[in-house]
From Swiss-Prot:
Main location: membrane
Protein's name according to its UniProt entry: Serpentine receptor class gamma-17
Membrane topology: Multi-pass membrane protein
Record key words, sorted: Membrane, Transmembrane, Transmembrane helix
GO CC terms, sorted: membrane
Length: 320
């Protein structure tokens, strides 16, 4: 099927009717909490993959959680340095939008990466709640079971999102008007295969798993508190807390899928806030609920401080 490249000008993309100061204030506020989330995610990745790798590498939950961390980090980087900055800083729109007036590979790669990460977030949610449920249902064989399943789960999280992204990959990805700036959209090459359809299927499937698995986990924790180790119990409560943030995403996605009149500016902002809570919240919740991660982070900071002081003392002694 042949396609003709679409060319847009900045006047058709940029809307001058939005208050610049108000839009900039929205970006400043969102960039602040997204930056906190990005710092927490990078810190977690450093602890899990580098500084305390021996402790976490054999824990199947943290292997699954790594995928969530990478996906969230991708989304946070995209939002801070591209998505939100060009949406909420309208004064940039006339200059920057000219670079994206025609479909480009760069824009397509960004859009695919962003939405791949969103699919991974939903899929990792499914596997994490399954992991916690199996921990309380079969504590004796849980480790052996997930040692076999985790590589398969990791492969699924990497590959399955492309089942919902293939239409983007063959379509024209363009800049589109969003508030006073611009965002990224696409012209469907295959009309029925919309991204929102595939995302809704994935999110609603994850919602079903989340409700069932979290309910079972919560119930069994009350019954088997003596048979579940404290660290596993802590991870169960972590998973339950992350699931609560996912419910916000599922709720807004379900509203968009079923209510055509709800697609207003306020609802779009509410959807962004729901995704932000899910993206930022997972790392913050993990730090708040996991004592070992907190101690690892603070101990590494203390080591750096001691190193700086020691080096300073050596330098002083040398010059004396």
């Amino acid at each position: 099927m042949g396609t003709t490249n679409l060319t847009l000008d900045s006047e058709s993309i940029c809307d001058p009717n939005y208050d610049i100061l108000f839009e900039n204030a929205i970006y400043f506020v969102t960039a602040c909490y997204l930056s906190v989330g990005l710092f927490c995610h990078i810190s977690l990745l450093k602890i899990i993959l580098i500084s305390d790798r021996k402790y976490f590498k054999d824990n199947s939950f943290f292997v699954l959680f790594r995928a969530d961390l990478f996906a969230s980090t991708t989304l946070l980087l995209y939002d801070i340095f591209f998505g939100r900055i060009f949406m909420y800083i309208p004064q940039l729109c006339p200059f920057v939008s000219t670079f994206f007036s025609t479909p480009t590979i760069f824009l397509k790669v960004l859009y695919v990466a962003q939405n791949h990460a969103r699919f991974v977030k939903s899929l990792s949610q499914i596997f994490m709640v399954l992991n916690r449920m199996s921990c309380v249902l079969m504590p004796a064989t849980y480790n052996q079971f997930w040692n076999k399943i985790t590589p398969i789960a990791s492969f699924i999280m990497l590959i399955l999102p492309f089942a919902g992204l293939w239409n983007i990959m063959i379509s024209q990805v363009i800049a589109s008007s969003v508030r006073g700036g611009f965002g990224v959209d696409y012209i469907k090459a295959v009309k029925w295969a919309s991204l929102s359809l595939f995302q809704s299927i994935c999110i609603l499937t994850a919602l079903g798993f989340t409700i069932v698995c979290t309910s079972v986990t919560f119930y069994k924790l009350a019954c088997l508190s003596d048979r579940v180790r404290s660290i596993e119990r802590s991870l169960c409560f972590t998973s339950i807390s992350i699931s609560c943030t996912f419910l916000l995403v599922a709720g807004t996605q379900l509203t968009f899928a079923t209510c055509a009149s709800c697609k207003t500016d306020a609802m779009y902002i509410l959807q962004f806030l729901a995704f932000d809570t899910f993206n930022v919240g997972s790392a913050i919740i993990m730090f708040l609920t996991n004592r070992h991660l907190r101690s690892s982070m603070f101990s590494s900071q203390k080591k750096r401080a001691v190193t700086v002081v020691t080096v300073g003392q050596i330098s002083t002694n040398t010059y004396n």
